[in-house]
Regions:
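Active-site histidine-anchored catalytic micro-motif
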Residues: 2-147
Length: 147
């Protein structure tokens, strides 16, 4: 039996993307910024983690189409409307329980394969930051791992 062991050095590159949101609920396409971080990393094969650094926001993959973004907001508002007296969490003095629920439904992060130095998307796929308690400074972690 012949066994081969291939050793290579794994590279890591971490960067935070910072931006301000204008609205309480907002969906922002961050694909270009993530691609910039990937290019700066020099990594050609691996994985790219994109992670919201806030408990009331989300990172997800979908299509860049305005009607679809409006549909997401409408659906999420139907699921967890802004209603301060509806949620027990808001008894703590907060008024953003609806934002926590929206984040849980939409997810915290995405991981995208890197192939040939590019994000390996399906047709129409883009990376979005979903803000559910906005109008302030926000951060997204991008961690690129590979060779």
């Amino acid at each position: 039996m012949i066994c081969f062991v291939i050793l290579y050095e794994v590279k890591l590159h971490t960067e935070h993307i910072s931006f301000n949101t204008k609205d309480k609920i907002e969906i922002v396409n961050i694909t270009d910024e993530v691609e910039r971080v990937l290019k700066e990393s020099g990594i050609k094969e691996g994985l790219c983690l994109v992670n919201s650094m806030h408990i009331t926001s989300s990172v997800f993959i979908n299509d860049e189409e305005e009607g679809l973004k409006e549909d997401f907001v409408k659906w999420l508002e139907g699921l967890a409307p802004y209603a301060p007296d509806k949620y027990k969490h808001n008894l703590t003095g907060e008024d953003n329980a609806h934002s926590h629920i929206k984040r849980t439904v939409m997810g915290r992060e995405v991981v995208v394969a890197i192939t040939g130095g590019k994000l390996d998307f399906g047709t129409w796929e883009q990376i979005f930051y979903g803000e559910f308690d906005g109008q302030r400074s926000k951060r997204v972690l991008v961690k690129v791992i590979g060779e």
